[in-house]
């Protein structure tokens, strides 16, 4: 309902609100997964209203990364194969080498040939992190990235997410109900009932 905001390039931005406030719906719209009933959405310099579904898919494949609460790993593929898939779709000739380097970076050098069912929740989310950064996205959307993890594991995943993001210079948008996590981002957009309650910068660097 009359939602308007901008996310600065290279910043870490959070969208918070109670269940049913519209957080995930808003993420879907911003990422071009859904179409708005009114208004315009610009993503990485492209007006999504001007693109058809195939063109939006190409834009996402090239510019956008995703991290989901339930990991969204392909169960019949190993950790390495899950990371390699988007690289191969982009025609990366050294997909296997890049995938191995990413899994080493997230601390899974000894688990890359394991299947998701053989990995803990924290390990699965680290595979998801490696996959999300594999195509060097301009912007990364993380939907409740620690929602299925215990507090200690969730903290390790967030530290890793922030570290990888800093190295890559990616714009990061986090959907969360965790205000403590939101306060570590540079800007917080608060939603309630599908409307913006506040949009404030924080002291986080």
What are these regions (language model features)?
Residues 1-191:
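ABC family nucleotide-binding domain
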């Amino acid at each position: 309902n009359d939602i308007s905001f901008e996310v600065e390039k290279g910043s870490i931005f959070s969208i918070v609100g109670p269940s049913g406030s519209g957080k995930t719906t808003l993420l879907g719209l911003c990422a071009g997964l859904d179409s708005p009933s009114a208004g315009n959405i610009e993503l990485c310099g492209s007006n999504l209203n001007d693109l058809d579904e195939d063109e939006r898919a190409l834009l996402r494949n090239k510019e956008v990364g995703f991290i989901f609460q339930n990991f969204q790993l392909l169960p019949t593929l190993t950790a390495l194969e899950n990371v390699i898939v988007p690289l191969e779709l982009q025609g990366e000739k050294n997909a296997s080498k890049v995938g191995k380097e990413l899994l080493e970076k997230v601390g899974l050098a000894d688990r890359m040939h394991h299947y998701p069912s053989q990995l803990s929740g924290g390990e699965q989310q680290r595979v998801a992190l490696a996959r999300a950064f594999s195509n060097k996205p301009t912007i990364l959307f993380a939907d409740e990235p620690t929602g299925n993890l215990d507090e200690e594991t969730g903290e390790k995943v967030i530290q890793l997410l922030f570290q990888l993001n800093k190295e890559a210079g990616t714009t990061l948008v986090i959907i969360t109900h965790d205000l403590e996590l939101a306060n570590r981002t540079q800007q917080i957009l608060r939603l309630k009932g599908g409307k913006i309650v506040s949009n404030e910068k924080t002291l986080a660097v």
